[in-house]
Amino acid sequence: MTQDITQQDVLDAPFMKEMMNTTYDMWKLGWDELNGGNISYLLKEEEVRSYFDLNQVKRTISLDFPVIELANQYFLVTGSGKFFRKIIENPEECLAVLRVTSDGESVELLWGLSDGGRPTSELASHFMSHIVRLKHDPNHRVIMHTHATNLIAMTFTHELDEVQFTRTLWQMCTECLVVFPEGVGILPWMVPGTSEIGKATAEKMNEYRLAIWSHHGIFGAGESIDQVFGLIETVEKAAKVYNLVNAHPDGAKQVITDQQLIDLAEAFHVNPPNKYFS
């Protein structure tokens, strides 16, 4: 006997509320214009089972890349071409609950994309990054991509060297080194929506939870939507400070010093790699 579950029950799910509220917040911040940005949220089977009949597959969508490592895993993802500002109004059209097939060659749609749409065009980057982050953190659950305004601007005016870029961010806001002590990865400009950018992003995820797409946006990874949103929010704040400082005719008169960064790391028990201080 299948459980009779109404749409309202589904929209009351904590993971659904998180996705709806966060995407709206991201739009209000100006990070996700038009259909920009995408999120994927790894769900536990017991979470999904409480709201969906797992035997009812609406349709199967083939993948251009195999993800056997994610076989039988469940994801809540944003849809391709969907506006973040509309998700809170029409989640069933704009979101999707997917299950990766046992062979990793396809995903099964359990809910959502009611207009016949498809999952985010960046699904390759998301799945590849999930695979890598799960190897480093078994509690990993979220990949988030957004067009953070000040960070994009910074990729035009700052050298795209990961060590120097990270150091600059750390020097702009005291909390930065504490929030992302491993630093940030940087990709050169690449065509989005391809397996190539997915592979390059996943490679960065071996070392970082944040991968900047030059002149485009940022990818973030973490254990919850709040954690990843906070990571990106912190980087974006530092980039804004950098842009404000560099707009001043005299630039910066002082910054947080290396010794102060070292003292900060010791005080908060984080271990930034030595490469940032050599």
Swiss-Prot record:
Which cofactors is this protein said to need? Answer: Zn(2+)
Q: Name one GO cellular component term.
A: cytosol
Q: What's a Pfam family this protein contains?
A: Aldolase_II
EC category: lyase
A Gene Ontology biological process noted in the UniProt record is: rhamnose catabolic process
Segment forming the signal sequence: none
In which family does this protein belong, per the annotation?
Answer: Belongs to the aldolase class II family. RhaD subfamily.
Outline what the protein does: Catalyzes the reversible cleavage of L-rhamnulose-1-phosphate to dihydroxyacetone phosphate (DHAP) and L-lactaldehyde.
The cross-references to PANTHER family, in alphabetical order and at most eight, read: 3-OXO-TETRONATE 4-PHOSPHATE DECARBOXYLASE-RELATED, FUCULOSE PHOSPHATE ALDOLASE
- GO MF, any single term: metal ion binding
Q: Which residues of this UniProt protein bind Zn(2+)? A: 145, 147, 216
- What does the Swiss-Prot or TrEMBL cofactor note state? Binds 1 zinc ion per subunit.
What gene does the UniProt entry assign to this protein?
A: rhaD
EC number(s): the record gives 4.1.2.19
Describe the reaction catalysed, as an equation: L-rhamnulose 1-phosphate = (S)-lactaldehyde + dihydroxyacetone phosphate
InterPro entries this protein is in?
Answer: Aldolase_class_II_sugar_metab, Aldolase_II/adducin_N, Aldolase_II/adducin_N_sf, Rhamnulose-1-P_Aldolase
Where it sits in the cell: the answer is: Cytoplasm
Name it. Rhamnulose-1-phosphate aldolase
Q: Which UniProt keywords apply?
A: Cytoplasm, Lyase, Metal-binding, Rhamnose metabolism, Zinc
Q: Which pathway does the UniProt entry assign to this protein?
A: Carbohydrate degradation; L-rhamnose degradation; glycerone phosphate from L-rhamnose: step 3/3
Residues at the active site: 122
